[in-house]
UniProtKB/Swiss-Prot annotation:
One Pfam family in the UniProt entry: AP2
A single GO molecular function term of this UniProt record: DNA-binding transcription factor activity
Disordered, as annotated region: 101-133
Organism field: Arabidopsis thaliana
Origin superkingdom: Eukaryota
Subcellular localization: Nucleus
Keywords per UniProt: Activator, DNA-binding, Ethylene signaling pathway, Nucleus, Transcription, Transcription regulation
Protein family per UniProt: Belongs to the AP2/ERF transcription factor family. ERF subfamily.
Protein name: Ethylene-responsive transcription factor ERF003
Length: 181
């Protein structure tokens, strides 16, 4: 029977014994690989460092954090590239949260003005446009991530039509018995 081991958030053990760590961001729907480590504790500390970089002080970590502690060599488990990537995720999530807050405020203002006009909030919600565009601007401005659902759907339909046209000949036959008059 295997010896019970303490489980850490964002850490798992490979079948040959090494420990790996990764972190996921729930808002951005991203997963970032943090690396392979010799011990579960090192992997958990790397996760904690990444969580603080990606989510700020509100991050859920494996170990308590003391900002006044003297940094040791084990506290630098993440590379500079990985640290920069995590910081970009943090900035993108801040911007996404800020956009969500402004959208909520404008929706609240619209529903209040609609209520004062005698229209219910549900009716004003239904009358608004169906497509919404979410845009995340990275700090350095290199990448813009846009989600626009209507054009994507039209592209998908167009692709399906092209596949049907180029698929080859299709023979259609009737499954109903023919009636004689």
């Amino acid at each position: 029977m295997a010896r019970p081991q303490q489980r850490f958030r964002g850490v798992r053990q490979r079948h040959w014994g090494s420990w790996v760590s990764e972190i996921r961001h729930p808002l951005l729907k991203t997963r970032i690989w943090l690396g392979t480590f010799e011990t579960a504790e090192d992997a958990a500390r790397a996760y904690d460092e990444a969580a603080r970089l990606m989510c700020g002080p509100r991050a859920r970590t494996n170990f308590p954090y003391n900002p006044n502690a003297i940094p040791t060599s084990s506290s630098k488990l993440l590379s500079a590239t990985l640290t920069a990537k995590l910081h970009k995720c943090y900035m993108a999530s801040l911007q996404m949260t800020k956009q969500t807050q402004t959208q909520t405020q404008t929706q609240t203002a619209r529903s209040q003005s609609a209520d004062s006009d005698g229209v219910t909030a549900n009716e004003s919600h239904l009358n608004r446009g169906v497509t919404e565009t979410t845009e995340i601007k990275w700090e350095d401005g290199n990448a813009n991530m846009q989600q626009n659902f209507r054009p994507l759907e039209e592209d998908h339909i167009e692709q399906m039509i092209e596949e049907l046209l180029h698929y080859g000949s299709i023979e259609l036959c009737s499954v109903l018995p023919t009636q004689t008059l």
